[in-house]
């Protein structure tokens, strides 16, 4: 066993973060980032740091491992298409049930809520479940407070909307807080996409940019969970670089393969 594998085994055993689910190159990038921050050059040295019960570092590492790149209205062409999906659903179903799977710090489900409101949907008929495995990320999501940084301008991200000020409140020069009108549409809860039970009856599931970080053998369980959570005719949206494996591909028809939106078909 290499020093890196020993480190991963410790992380999984002592923190509960399932390193075995994730692509090893992804884990290496994230762990190495923490090592550089702490001035540690060897995996064995970083393991010693964690073994010394450095709770702060363990928390920082878990945050680094769990939270992926996220922003409001990431890939605008996808959100333009999703607006049409929501309008179509509003004409065909009484209540629109949406699941944002692996929602990280909440920007995706809040984007979905803002989009629904911006499209003129009745908020009483829209319900969004947002789940993630990381409790700290969920706490940040529930707070709904986001700050612009040098590399991520929240104002630019919200520029997809005509009137973003209807959905967020400014707090100082850099911070934005999602208002209650948006928050009321979203419920957050913890869920593990690999080991957790499927949901049921959803009209739309967003599972974007999740599988690109996951080891190949666990991608199928994730997409199996997602497909079982959609009603017949429900919509699935994946990340721009993600594809459906053959084992679940037959359960879907591509609505627009360029932007990875699919419809659930009846089981045969």
From Swiss-Prot:
Binding positions for S-adenosyl-L-methionine per the UniProt entry: 68, 70, 74, 108, 132, 192-193, 208-209
Domain CheR-type methyltransferase, residue spans: 1-265
Signal sequence, renumbered to the chain: none
GO molecular function term, any single one: protein-glutamate O-methyltransferase activity
Enzyme Commission code: 2.1.1.80
Disruption phenotype: Mutants show lack of Htr methylation.
Catalytic activity: L-glutamyl-[protein] + S-adenosyl-L-methionine = [protein]-L-glutamate 5-O-methyl ester + S-adenosyl-L-homocysteine
Stored Gene3D superfamilies: Chemotaxis receptor methyltransferase CheR, N-terminal domain (1.10.155.10), Vaccinia Virus protein VP39 (3.40.50.150)
Keywords assigned by UniProt, alphabetized: Chemotaxis, Methyltransferase, S-adenosyl-L-methionine, Transferase
SUPFAM superfamilies assigned to the protein according to its UniProt record, in alphabetical order: Chemotaxis receptor methyltransferase CheR, N-terminal domain, S-adenosyl-L-methionine-dependent methyltransferases
Function: Catalyzes the methylation of several Htr transducer proteins (methyl-accepting chemotaxis proteins) to form gamma-glutamyl methyl ester residues.
Biological process annotations from GO: chemotaxis; methylation
PROSITE patterns, per the entry: CHER (PS50123)
Protein name from the UniProt record: Chemotaxis protein methyltransferase
């Amino acid at each position: 066993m290499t020093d890196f594998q020993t480190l991963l085994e410790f992380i999984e055993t002592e923190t509960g973060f399932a390193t075995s689910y994730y692509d090893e190159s992804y884990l290496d990038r994230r762990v190495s980032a923490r090592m550089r921050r702490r001035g540690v050059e060897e995996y064995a040295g970083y393991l010693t740091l964690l073994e010394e019960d450095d709770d702060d570092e363990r928390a920082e590492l878990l945050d680094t491992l769990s939270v992926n790149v996220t922003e409001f209205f990431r890939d605008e062409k996808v959100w333009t298409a999703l607006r049409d999906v929501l309008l179509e659903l509003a004409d065909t179903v009484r209540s629109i049930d949406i699941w944002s799977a692996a929602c990280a710090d909440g920007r995706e489900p809040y984007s979905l809520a803002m989009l629904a409101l911006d499209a003129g949907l009745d908020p009483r008929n829209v319900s969004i479940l947002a789940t993630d495995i990381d409790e700290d990320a969920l706490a940040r999501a529930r707070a709904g407070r986001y700050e612009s940084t040098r590399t991520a301008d929240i104002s630019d991200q919200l520029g997809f909307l005509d009137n973003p000020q209807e959905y967020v409140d400014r707090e100082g020069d850099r911070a934005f807080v999602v208002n209650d009108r948006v928050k009321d549409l979203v419920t957050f809860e913890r869920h593990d996409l690999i080991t957790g039970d499927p949901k049921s009856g959803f009209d739309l599931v967003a599972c974007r940019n999740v599988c690109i970080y996951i080891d190949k053998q666990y991608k199928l369980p994730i997409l199996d969970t997602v497909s079982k959570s959609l009603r017949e005719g429900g919509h699935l949206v994946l990340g721009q670089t993600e594809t459906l494996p053959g084992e679940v591909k037959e359960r879907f028809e591509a609505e627009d393969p360029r932007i990875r939106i699919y419809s659930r078909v009846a089981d045969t």
